[in-house]
């Protein structure tokens, strides 16, 4: 009986020592984004107000994406839509897994903007960020022309 009690006591002390030993685990590093969107992208945007050619120049730090945007109307020069679709602006976005949430903003008063009194903002989500292709659903508004709905951007990256 004394031997059994001694063995049980020794085993309990050994388990206690093992469970208290060692250092705490180091914190896990933040996961790296699963997509890299840095670079120059060209494509087209089509929404309820018309079609636009689009160029992005993007930088990426971790899961944050930023850069510049230039758009040019697919309509003939001189049309109302051509004025409101020829703009330069800013791009900001956040990556979560393989999804990109983005905002594009066109400020009023930009040099060379044919409609300098108008601002425009669009927001969208790209759930298909495969290699050098990206498809984004978007919506937004132009302060002079109103809302644009049911938009789709299809972009390809230059390599």
What are the functions of these language-model segments?
Residues 1-19:
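Sec-dependent bacterial lipoprotein signal peptides
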Residues 16-38, 159:
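Bacterial Sec-dependent N-terminal signal peptides
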Residues 8, 18, 22, 31, ...:
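Intrinsically disordered, low-complexity segments enriched in Ser/Pro/Gly/Ala and basic residues
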Residues 129-144:
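Low-complexity, intrinsically disordered Gly/Pro/Thr-rich segments
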Residues 33-125, 145-158:
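Central antiparallel beta-sheet cores of small beta-barrel/beta-sandwich binding domains
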């Amino acid at each position: 009986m004394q031997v059994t009690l001694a063995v049980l006591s020794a085993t309990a002390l050994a388990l206690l020592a093992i469970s208290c030993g060692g250092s705490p685990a180091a914190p896990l590093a933040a996961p790296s984004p699963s997509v890299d969107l840095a670079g120059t992208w060209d494509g087209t945007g089509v929404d309820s107000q018309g079609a636009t050619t689009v160029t992005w120049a993007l930088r990426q730090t971790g899961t944050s994406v930023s850069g510049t945007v230039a758009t040019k109307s697919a309509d003939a020069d001189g049309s109302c839509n051509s004025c409101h679709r020829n703009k330069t602006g800013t791009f900001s976005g956040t990556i979560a897994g393989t999804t990109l949430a983005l905002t594009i903003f066109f400020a009023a008063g930009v040099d060379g903007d044919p409609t300098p009194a108008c601002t425009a903002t669009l927001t969208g989500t790209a759930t298909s960020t495969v290699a050098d292709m990206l498809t984004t659903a978007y919506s937004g508004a132009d302060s002079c022309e109103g809302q644009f709905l049911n938009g789709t951007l299809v972009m390809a990256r230059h390599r």
